[in-house]
Swiss-Prot record:
InterPro entries for the chain: Class_I_gatase-like, CobQ/CobB/MinD/ParA_Nub-bd_dom, CobQ_GATase1, CobQ_N, CobQ_synth, GATase_3, P-loop_NTPase
Pfam families: CbiA, GATase_3
GO terms for MF: ABC-type vitamin B12 transporter activity; catalytic activity
HAMAP family per UniProt: CobQ
Organism: Rippkaea orientalis (strain PCC 8801 / RF-1) (Cyanothece sp. (strain PCC 8801))
Family classification: Belongs to the CobB/CobQ family. CobQ subfamily.
CDD domains: CobQ_N (cd05389), GATase1_CobQ (cd01750)
Pathway stated in the Swiss-Prot or TrEMBL entry: Cofactor biosynthesis; adenosylcobalamin biosynthesis
GO biological process: cobalamin biosynthetic process
Record-given protein name: Cobyric acid synthase
Top-level taxon of the source organism: Bacteria
NCBIfam families recorded: cobQ (TIGR00313), PRK00784.1 (NF001989)
Amino acid sequence: MKAIMVVGTTSHAGKSFITTAICRILARQGWHVTPFKGQNMALNAYVTPTGGEIGHAQAVQAWAAKITPSVDMNPILLKPQGNMTSQVIIHGQAVGTTSAQEYYEQYFDRGWKAITSSLDCLASEYDVVVCEGAGSPAEINLKHRDLTNMRVAHHLNAATILVVDIDRGGAFAHVVGTLQLLEPEEKALIKGIVINKFRGQRSLLDSGIEWLENYTSIPVLGVIPWREIMFPSEDSLGLLDRPSYRSTTSLKISILRLPHISNFTDFDPLDAETTVNLNYLDLRGTLGYPDAVIIPGSKTTIADLIALHTTGMAQQLQDYVSAGGVILGICGGFQMLGQTVFDPDQLEGGQKAYKGLNLLPLETIITSNKIVRQRQIMSNYPYSGLPVTGYEIHQGITQLIQSYETEQTILLDQLFDDISLGFVNESQTIWGCYLHGLFDNGAWRRSWLNYLRQRRGLPSLPTGIANYREQREANLDAIADLVEEFVNLKPVFPK
């Protein structure tokens, strides 16, 4: 099996982007190619058809390669959950929660075995594996326990690309410093350098590139210009780079930027809608009166629920609802909508019960049992009979409170044909569900947006549209076209 490795001088250099592009380019050339990331730390996750959990970026890369995502493409997934701890997922299954120090003491050998086992499985099925590193391969305090970068490249004898983000400045120093900190046998694997996110006149780089090639004896394979192509970010730091409302188009939807926000790739399909403006709102910000507010998934529901209360955002949400606003909670956000979140085993906090937002007559019980599965269901709202697919990733069950006394009776109906997946209130202003990937469903997404548009007196949009995967396919081709145009990949490609 031919191996290609993509490492970066820093986080957010463009490793995922270029790995994805290479997968699509090779797939278009007829190669049977697979992505691979030995260990990924991310809160954006995807559920494979077998019920295993992997990083969402590896699922996107699998789609770029025109194959079905599998747990072998990301054998280790670490999901940060606060207090300097992470949930450890090996081959798709949660195996424990640990601190960084405990992880390397308890899971390093097991992790490397999982990585090599997955590589063996992929080697038996694919012609080419395109591996993605993590962070930097030259973190000298971490190299001895780095499971993701040059250890994998050396194991596979992979032709390796070093990517640098020039937009943040210091690109030449980053490249030289990274190469100087690699061992000679590691540096020998680097077959080329890619300069990413360049803005400006290309010729201004010529003298710098000539110097860099002479100094390092490694060719610069290309310079990728900055392009506004929709590509999912791996962690919430990417949300800081997003603009707020970018124009004055029809609908304004605010997504709360929870401290432990997860699976915010759920909202890429909304971002692709030209009539929608998304705003990721800090909890200390002013909510105002957008057309809808979304409370997204959370890796640590209780901590983020507490943050809603302590920042005053919970009160802003109450005022917003009283004024007729629309709220949608997904997964952890759904759990927060109820009256109480119970944590009997204190899995997330020091108490056994926490006050919810009290917007729906529901209660959630956090459990150690983790539900991870794909779903195919039918909708009841905003219209009945719409086919919906997605996936669940959550710990806990949410149920109606049997005896709920309030000044005004709140009537609920189930959102889908499976009552366990979500509810909507009678006025259709409070929506909650466990389903990730909900907005990938084109007809459901447009129907929900049309409901918001009708509230504003705006004309409806066509609902007979394809699911988001067709838009995603176009984006993947655009990414591949960009890299293919500006990067010479022949030195690392299979012959």
